[in-house]
Amino acid sequence: MITPQDACYLRVCLKLKAYDALAASDGILAAPAMDVAPALDATDFLLRCYYGGRALLALRRYPEAARWFQNALSAPATALSAIAVAAYKKYALATLLADAVADASTFSAPAKKYSTSRECDAYASLLAAAKKRDAAKELADVVERHEATYELDGNAGLVALVRDRAVAAKARSLAKTYSTLRLGDFASAIGFSDVEAAER
């Protein structure tokens, strides 16, 4: 059953970095959305989705985290809330970490979708860069351009993880395509400044 206390519990676990307690809280993280306590209001639901998504991010269960953030974004609302903005930022990162394509068409209202993207331009830019052919280079450029925003939001670590995964994916792709590529060419194709950086 979904209760107003779920979000509080998840938030405390995250604040204390009690990841073993989060892993043991599968009852909260797996509760069906139809079983709702009468005292639950819209803010409780949004917070539960947000902190549940963050908990799943901490447990590295990225596809599930993306679904939880998407639930917060698709909840009916007449105005954009700070919780929805924070959920959109984490949603963008979770979908990139899950190697999924962010689908904003499932959000409930076009105005909400527009407002969320406008409020979160740095994250919308990340999603757009990930879809490009040379995603590793594009992501690195976007990360550099919006670095202060990611730091301010407390998402710099997740953004760095997204960037590193894009570089690793590019390296795997090149390794499959070219088995006899010189290290210098490999470094420039991935976007490293020199051979030494590629060796690390």
Each PLM stretch: what is its role?
Residues A23, D44-E199:
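Alpha-helical scaffold segments of alpha-solenoid architecture
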Residues A7-K17, Y51-A55, L93:
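Tandem amphipathic alpha-helical repeat scaffolds
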Residues L14-P32, E64-Q70:
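Helix-turn-helix repeat elements of alpha-solenoid scaffolds
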Residues M1, P32-L40, A77-A79:
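Flexible helix-coil transition and linker loops at the boundaries of alpha-helical arrays
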Residues M1-T3, L16-A23, P38-T43, R60-P63:
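Alpha-helix boundary/capping segments in eukaryotic regulatory proteins
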Residues M1-L16, A98-D99, D103-K112:
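Charged/polar interaction segments and conserved charged motifs
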Residues T3-L10, L22, D26, F45, ...:
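Hydrophobic, well-ordered secondary-structure segments
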